[in-house]
Amino acid sequence: MGSKRRNLSCSERHQKLVDENYCKKLHVQALKNVNSQIRNQMVQNENDNRVQRKQFLRLLQNEQFELDMEEAIQKAEENKRLKELQLKQEEKLAMELAKLKHESLKDEKMRQQVRENSIELRELEKKLKAAYMNKERAAQIAEKDAIKYEQMKRDAEIAKTMMEEHKRIIKEENAAEDKRNKAKAQYYLDLEKQLEEQEKKKQEAYEQLLKEKLMIDEIVRKIYEEDQLEKQQKLEKMNAMRRYIEEFQKEQALWRKKKREEMEEENRKIIEFANMQQQREEDRMAKVQENEEKRLQLQNALTQKLEEMLRQREDLEQVRQELYQEEQAEIYKSKLKEEAEKKLRKQKEMKQDFEEQMALKELVLQAAKEEEENFRKTMLAKFAEDDRIELMNAQKQRMKQLEHRRAVEKLIEERRQQFLADKQRELEEWQLQQRRQGFINAIIEEERLKLLKEHATNLLGYLPKGVFKKEDDIDLLGEEFRKVYQQRSEICEEK
């Protein structure tokens, strides 16, 4: 029973293990199924999400496409509107530019006509041309004077060069003369030295001769002592020797005297040469001084001549300017006189015209009154004839006559209004003409100032009188021009 129980237990355990393994397998299988379901569900969810995402993206793309299309349409409409606006602006700008160009051409044409027809501008251009001619003439005179000055300067330089060359030659000659004098002096010194050496040699020879004489005397004495027999011969020999010595001494004295005389003559010649050299040097210095004075005189003469020429040129230019200014002043005076006479004549003509106009106005008014009166009578008569007033009773006659007078007065008032309208139109035309004349005068003034600004600076100092109408013209040309113009005016007044 015990073994059976043990066997059962083993079977049970085995069965239990089998059951447990089976349960585990079932559990694993269930887990696998669950995992598979979960994976499938996740895949399904992911597919659904992908589809939803694609649908959402497609929806967004459609909305973005619609927005882009709408924006493109709006942008195209805006571009079209901007192009139309730009086209209108360009057309407006082109019209304005054409208008400005037309006005500019019209203004330029009018200015050209004013320039061509303005007497004042033509006179100013003539004066400016005359100033340019004066400037050119002054430049030519200055150029001629400059050429003369350069010629005189070259002549002065040539004279200076010749003087320097002359001085150099004199200096070289003096240097050569000094060199020769030094050579002569050295020669005389060498000669004197040779003479001294010769004198010294002769003195030494003389001393040697004396020594020999003493020796001879000693020998003679010894010979006299030794050989009495030969005494006479020796004495004669001694006498001969003495005579020789005496003759030698005489000759030496004569030679010394001659040499002294020669030395004195040489010294005299040297002194004469030195005096002559000094005199020559003094003559040379005097000649140099004379040449220097001549050069200075020539230079002063050239300078004075140049100054005289410059002064004559300035005087001539001043005379020309004064003559030109006087001529221009006379022209200006005659012009002022003509303008005054013209103005006076114009005033007289205007006065006469005014009187004639007043008289004519009186006549016109009188004629108008007479015409109105005649017109009134005529119209009243016409109305009366048309309406047969005489056939009416008194009340109707008065009413009809009053009606006729009113009609006539209305016609007369209409004629008056027409007359006033005509006069108003004439006044407006006259005012327009005055404005046009004022505009023309402004153009003339602008062109005049333009000409002055363009040419006055280049013609400063050559402008004739009458170019500037007022002081403001000078101020308009700048501070520097005004200062230079005032300085030149002060210089002309001082002259």
Swiss-Prot record:
Organism annotation: Homo sapiens
Keywords recorded for this protein, A-Z: Cell projection, Cilium, Coiled coil, Cytoplasm, Cytoskeleton, Disease variant, Flagellum, Heterotaxy, Meiosis, Nucleus, Phosphoprotein
GO molecular function: identical protein binding
GO CC aspect terms: axonemal A tubule inner sheath; axonemal microtubule; axoneme; ciliary basal body; cilium; cytosol; intermediate filament; motile cilium
Biological processes annotated in GO: cilium organization; flagellated sperm motility; left/right axis specification; meiotic cell cycle; positive regulation of cilium assembly; sperm axoneme assembly
Clinical condition linked: Heterotaxy, visceral, 9, autosomal, with male infertility: A form of visceral heterotaxy, a complex disorder due to disruption of the normal left-right asymmetry of the thoracoabdominal organs. Visceral heterotaxy or situs ambiguus results in randomization of the placement of visceral organs, including the heart, lungs, liver, spleen, and stomach. The organs are oriented randomly with respect to the left-right axis and with respect to one another. It can be associated with a variety of congenital defects including cardiac malformations.
Statement: the UniProt record of this protein carries the keyword Aminoacyl-tRNA synthetase: no
Sites of Phosphotyrosine modification: 188
Pfam families: TPH (PF13868)
Complex and partners: Able to form oligomers. Microtubule inner protein component of sperm flagellar doublet microtubules. Interacts with ODAD1. Interacts with BBOF1.
Region described as Interaction with BBOF1: 1-314
Keyword Phosphoprotein found: yes
Family label: Belongs to the MNS1 family.
Residue stretches in coiled coil: 28-410
PANTHER family, sorted: MEIOSIS-SPECIFIC NUCLEAR STRUCTURAL PROTEIN 1 (PTHR19265:SF0)
Tissue-level expression: Expressed in nasal respiratory epithelium and in the sperm.
Domain of life: Eukaryota
UniProt cross-references to InterPro entries, sorted A to Z: MNS1, TPH_dom
UniProt protein name: Meiosis-specific nuclear structural protein 1
Membrane spanning residue stretches: none
